[in-house]
Amino acid sequence: MYDYPCKKSDTINHKKCFDMSWSFEYKEIHTNAKKMVLMAKTHMERNEVSFCQIPFCHTVEGESLGAIIEIGNTYEPRCKYEKCKELDDVLALDDIDFTNGRIAEVILAAQLLVDENIEVIVNVSGPLTILYSLISPVKLFKGYRQSPEKVCAVFKKINDNIVEYVQVLKKSGVSKISFADPTASLPILGPERLKRHLKEVHKPLLRSLMAEFGDKGVIILCPKITYGLIGFGEGRLVEISSTMSGLISRGCVNENHKHEEGQTLIID
C-alpha cells in the first residue's frame, strides 16, 4: 500500500509571516479571532494565494474537549500531557462548547473572513489526532485488544463532535474545509490497524461530513487518508471538473473559486 510521504515543505510556516511591528505576541494568532484573521490575510497576500486558511495548528478540537495544550511564542501549540488516563475518562468528557475558548475564536475568524468575501478554508483535525491529545496511544492500542466496543464508543464521541463542528462552521458561511488526521498513518498504526481504522472510523465520518455539505461545499482531503482508502479498496480517484463539489484530494482552489488540477475521491 502506498503511504503518502509528508514533507516539511508541505507545512505552512506562519511564523515567517509574523510582522514584528505588530503590537501583540505570536501566540495570540492562535487565541484571538482578529489576530488570526490578520495573520491569515498576511499569509494570503505574501504567498499570492486566493484564500485564507485557519487555524494554524491541529490542537483546537482536542483542547475544546479538555486536552491540556501549551501555546508559546517560539513553538506551535502542543499537548503538554494527556489529561485522560483511561478510555472511560474520554467518554466522561463534556462535548465541545462552540461558544467558548479557542474553537469559538476560530469560528468567529472564519465568519469575519466570510463577511469580507474572502475565501476561507478551515482546517479540521481527524479523530485520531484529537484523541492523541487526550490519552496515551499505548492506552488506546490496549483498548483495541481488550475493549474494542469501548474504543468504538470513544471514536463515535469524537466523530460526533467533529460533525457538529462542521455544522457550526457551515452556519457561519464556511463552504470549504481541509480534513487531515496526521497520526492515522501506516508507520504509526501498521497495515491491519490502519485498515480497520479507515473503514470503521474515517469512512463513516467522511460520509457524514459530505452529507452536511451536500453539493454546496468542498472537503479537501489529506493525501494520506486518500491513499489509505484507495489502498484498502475503500475508495477510488477520478478526475474533477471545475463545477464538482464533494471530496477533493490533491486539488486546489483558483482565483475564480473553482477546483482544478486535482482529483476527487469516490468512497465505495
Predicted segment positions?
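N-terminal basic, low-complexity leaders that serve as flexible interaction/assembly modules and, when applicable
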Residues: 1-73, 192-220, 227-268
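Conserved acidic
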Residues: 32, 150, 154, 190
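Conserved, mostly hydrophobic/aromatic
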Residues: 44, 113, 162, 169, ...
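Short beta-strand segments at enzyme active-site cores
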Residues: 52-55, 120-123, 174-181, 216-222
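Active-site-proximal loop/turn and secondary-structure-junction residues that shape catalytic pockets
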Residues: 56-58, 126-128, 183-185, 223-227
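Active-site-proximal, glycine-rich beta->alpha crossover segments in alpha/beta enzymes
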Residues: 68-165
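Active-site-proximal loop/short-helix segments
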Residues: 123-143, 172-197
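Alpha/beta enzyme core
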Residues: 156-176, 203
